[in-house]
A protein has these predicted regions:
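Extended polysaccharide-engagement surfaces of secreted carbohydrate-active enzymes
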Residues: 171
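Substrate-recognition/specificity elements adjacent to catalytic centers across diverse enzyme folds
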Residues: 2-168
């Protein structure tokens, strides 16, 4: 959606409210997944998926990052939480599966950006073997070439390569 506000925080609030209007279940599931709490909603078979998630992302770390963030960033994060929570307040017919109140630290669960680590490449079965009754076999993959990078289309341009003489970061 196109959202306009007098401040950046106003725009964040409006964007999250609009996103919840479009698909609150997806918004909530994204954060349930990020917190490694899917098994609480979908059942025990998701426990190892949650474990894998928690090996990479830590809610306590997200809270710590939020607490030490500059005031301008805290305002944006609070606007995120306020936008989702206001949506829930004004739509009592919407019943969250797990998260009844969104917190301003939650966006830091995604602080790696879209080009961060790909936890899906870590085998849930290997995690089950390691923590369960099975044994883990070490695998060494030999490659003659580097693996193809995966992620978003973000890239940087050095000042010497730009017409303006300025560095550019395109995300």
């Amino acid at each position: 959606p196109h959202v306009y506000g007098k401040t950046d925080a106003d725009a964040v609030f409006g964007f999250l409210y609009a996103q919840c209007e479009d698909d609150f279940p997806r918004v909530e599931l994204n954060y349930i997944t990020a917190m490694g709490r899917v098994a609480e909603v979908e059942g025990e078979e998701k426990l190892y998926h949650d474990l894998r998630q928690r090996l990479f992302y830590d809610t306590l770390m997200a809270e710590s990052i939020y607490r030490t963030s500059p005031a301008w960033l805290k305002r944006l994060c609070q606007a995120f939480a306020d936008g989702v929570n206001y949506y829930l307040q004004t739509h009592p017919e919407v019943k969250p599966k797990l998260i009844n109140r969104f917190q301003p630290w939650m966006p830091f669960l995604f602080s790696e950006g879209s080009i961060g680590v790909d936890i899906e490449s870590i085998s849930v079965n290997r995690i089950k073997e390691f923590y369960g009754k099975g044994s883990v076999q070490l695998e060494v993959e030999h490659r003659n070439e580097e693996p193809e990078p995966r992620g978003s289309n973000g890239f940087a341009i050095a000042p010497a390569r730009s017409a303006s003489g300025n560095a550019m970061l395109l995300i």
